Swiss-Prot record:
ATP binds at G48, K49, G50, G51, V52, G53, K54, S55. Changing C218A: Decrease in activity. Lack of activity. Residues 1-18 have a biased composition (Low complexity). This is Iron-sulfur cluster carrier protein. Binds and transfers iron-sulfur (Fe-S) clusters to target apoproteins. Can hydrolyze ATP. The lineage of its organism: Archaea, Methanobacteriati, Methanobacteriota, Methanomada group, Methanococci. GO terms for biological process: iron-sulfur cluster assembly.
Amino acid sequence: MAEECSGNCDSCGSSSDCSDTKKMMEQQNAQIRDNMSKIKYKIAVMSGKGGVGKSTVTVNLAATLNMMGYKVGVLDGDIHGPNIPQMLGVDQIQPMADENGIYPVSTPQGIKTMSIGYFLPDKNTPIIWRGPKASGAIRQFLSDVNWGELDFLLIDTPPGSGDIQITTLQAIPDIDGVVIVTTPEEVSVLDARKSVSAANTLEIPIIGIVENMGGFVCPECDKVIDIFGKGGGEKAAKELNVFFLGRIPLDIKARVASDRGVPMVTMDCKASEEFKKVVNTVLERIKKE
């Protein structure tokens, strides 16, 4: 629809274009509904700001569920920062496609993934897209990707609460809820509060808040040191009447694993232990709904 649209279709020379676009959107919505109907739980992972470990939480939530025997898919909705392929060690693989749609790239463990990162010529190529084009790509991943039957689809959304995030959340029929990721410091917690408000405005259930980087595990003594402060996520959860899912500490072992494309939950470390507790709490929460 043109930016100067008066709302009077009878006097508009572009009304046929609008009509065609509307039909295409309706067809795409129908395809999204059909695709998503084969997936039991749809969970979005959000953050109010970048750099808090949202993608790390998404990847390890997926890996833990996969280790528990669930069929899991991950949609990398962070169009301008598509890191999921590298974090799962499948960044050298390209998706296949035929008349039935685009097929997700599967990890050796069987986690299905889709990301704009698979379609870039190299890792240094930026995505210089405005909001509508980026939103359209996410809708296409929901409609055209042949996800098949899954127990869980996790959507790694872009940071913030703008048009791309809204389009993503509203495009998913019967979304089961959002997990909001923050770090302990006040600036991050402030942005997490905005994510809570955005989810409430869109009437999407909030599964809970995860406090990532909740302390640093000393590699010498294994003691957790609160270098970013302590308890900011839990405090915000109480004030906002949102469930607190747990704290994930920074762990050098986890960082090394992530750089190699290996989820931290496969490692023997404190971060892995705490993350598995978070996942069990998420399962309890969604199965109560």
